[in-house]
């Protein structure tokens, strides 16, 4: 019997290892094929956060991890109801505004449009509404947007993207609220909602390498002796900037196609000086909101209380007028 349990445990461990390896291979393959072999438009890929931070996209400090790759800060907005009833579908609208005329560099260095992506962190128990609970009107508003849970056990954390920014500056999430009557882990009260939205490509890959959508800096102090343009076997163009220090060998900084060089041969530079402009026009923003899971019975009692107060006020007014009439009659008598 013990051997059977041991075998089952080993089988589960083996499956977990295989799954992890497959995810890693898929991630690495996608990275190289999408950005090198098949350059795409400037995109925002929220699933990088899934692969790099599988537990949660929010750090203990409150920062959403997308900011680790998208270094520029931009505005993100969210609209959620102030309160919702249990087991109801409502809209959470994430707005990712940017200048639609803006273009940035793609992986091949060409100017392309921006894509957008978003992560919506709902309270425990909240999740994307199943299709049979979404009204036809809401389906039209959502369009072809595909919603993906951050992980199998976190249906309340949802990611979307990449989507074409020209069409999706507003992303509508159809959210189903939980019902405390059927789930004892859920309680009525006020909850926090965390939202992150990014437009365009990041400046740093999850591996720590810079993308070509970033500023490149001098790695040594000295004089630029040569700037050469080179193309590798895969057709990727890059610039080689030779820096001659006062002593020692020449230092060669590689700049990919995309950012524009702002230095020239014969120019003196210091370590950290910018060799290129900043081509990035996108960025990431996050915002928090609050939502109340309202008890319908409390709402009914509140309505009854307000009605009672209003009735009492009406009765007082009528009584006051009655007293005034009696007083007037006594004075006339």
Swiss-Prot record:
It is a multi-pass membrane protein. It holds the Pfam family Apocytochr_F_C. GO terms for cellular component: plasma membrane-derived thylakoid membrane. Binds 1 heme group covalently. InterPro entries: Cyt-f_TM (IPR024058), Cyt_f (IPR002325), Cyt_f_lg_dom (IPR024094), Cyt_f_lg_dom_sf (IPR036826), Rudment_hybrid_motif (IPR011054). GO terms for biological process: photosynthesis. PROSITE patterns: CYTF. Keywords: Electron transport, Heme, Iron, Membrane, Metal-binding, Photosynthesis, Signal, Thylakoid, Transmembrane, Transmembrane helix, Transport. Its cofactor is heme. Residues 1-16 form the signal peptide. NCBIfam families: PRK02693.1. This is Cytochrome f. The gene is petA.
């Amino acid at each position: 019997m013990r051997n059977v349990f041991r075998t089952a445990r080993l089988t589960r461990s083996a499956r977990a290892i295989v799954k992890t390896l497959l995810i890693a291979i898929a991630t690495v393959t996608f990275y190289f094929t999408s950005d090198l072999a098949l350059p795409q438009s400037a995109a925002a890929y929220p699933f990088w956060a899934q692969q790099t931070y599988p537990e949660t996209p929010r750090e203990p400090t409150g920062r959403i991890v997308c900011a680790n790759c998208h270094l520029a800060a931009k505005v993100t907005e969210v609209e959620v109801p102030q309160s919702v009833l249990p087991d109801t579908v409502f809209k959470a609208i994430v707005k990712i505004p940017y200048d639609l005329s803006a273009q940035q560099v793609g992986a091949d260095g060409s100017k392309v449009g921006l894509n957008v992506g978003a992560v919506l962190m709902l309270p425990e128990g909240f999740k994307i509404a199943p299709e049979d609970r979404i009204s036809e009107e809401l389906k039209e508003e959502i369009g072809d947007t595909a919603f993906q849970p951050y992980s199998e056990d976190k249906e309340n954390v949802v990611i979307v993207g990449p989507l074409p920014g020209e069409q999706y500056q507003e992303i509508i999430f159809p959210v189903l609220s939980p019902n405390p009557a059927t789930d004892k882990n859920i309680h009525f009260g006020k909850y926090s909602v965390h939202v992150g939205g990014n437009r365009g490509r990041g400046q740093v890959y999850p591996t720590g390498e810079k993308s070509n959508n970033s500023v490149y800096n001098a790695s040594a102090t000295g004089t630029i002796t040569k700037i050469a343009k080179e193309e590798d076997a895969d057709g990727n163009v890059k610039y080689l900037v030779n820096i001659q220090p006062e002593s020692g060998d020449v230092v060669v900084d590689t700049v990919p196609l995309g950012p524009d060089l702002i230095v020239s041969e014969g120019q003196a530079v210091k370590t950290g000086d910018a060799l290129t402009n900043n081509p990035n026009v996108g960025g990431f923003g996050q915002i928090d909101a609050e939502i109340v899971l309202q008890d319908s019975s409390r709402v009914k009692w509140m309505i009854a209380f307000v009605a009672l107060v209003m009735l009492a006020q009406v009765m007082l007014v009528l009584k006051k007028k009655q007293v005034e009439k009696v007083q007037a009659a006594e004075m006339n008598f």
